Amino acid sequence: MEKKDLVEGMRLYIYKLRVDGRYSTAKSYQDALNSFMRFCGLEVIPYIYVNKENLRRYQAFLLNKGCTWNTVSTYMRRIRCVYNMAVEEGLAPYIPYLFKGVFTGIESKRKKALPQDLLRSLMTASFDDPELRKTRQALCLMFQFCGMAFVDFAHLKKENVRGGVLEYKRQKTG
């Protein structure tokens, strides 16, 4: 498979990600590709179609469809990655600041922390239901483990404690 256009370039990169076992990342690239193809209305997208004006129009298209700024950013960064690889290989023209006019940052409006009084009441609450007590204990442990992700907590085993020290590998990053 050649990378003669953006679609082929992205499909090849998605294939490599899957071979490397990076399935979530591959899905993210596939979602970006599907979205950009819908926007373009094309099955083959020449690299020259990726220009400042079309990227601005694509951003407006995504926002009009109700996508969040973080989705816009993710899709733009996925397209930029593959486009930059094509530039390095001489398959796409180098355009200075090509992605400057579109959002590629991270927007965080939502607060992710519990207020201290709510956390304290959850950690000290008394529950009659044994399942709720177990859940509260898990919450307390995850908090005491400095905000350990639930997926990491769920994969813990007795063998993870060595010499009084908890050792584990992150599920997300290995």
Task: Please describe what each predicted stretch is.
Residues N64, E88, S121-D128, E159:
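Conserved helix-loop functional segments at active or binding sites
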Residues H155-G174:
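Conserved tyrosine-mediated DNA breakage-rejoining catalytic core shared by Y-recombinases
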Residues E53-R56, R77, R120:
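Surface-exposed alpha-helical interface segments used for non-catalytic interactions
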Residues Y29, Y75, L132-R136:
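Short, leucine-enriched amphipathic alpha-helices that occur as contiguous helical runs
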Residues M1-K65:
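Basic/aromatic-enriched alpha-helical hairpins
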Residues S35-F36, N64-L98, M148:
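N-terminal DNA-binding recognition helix of tyrosine site-specific recombinases/integrases
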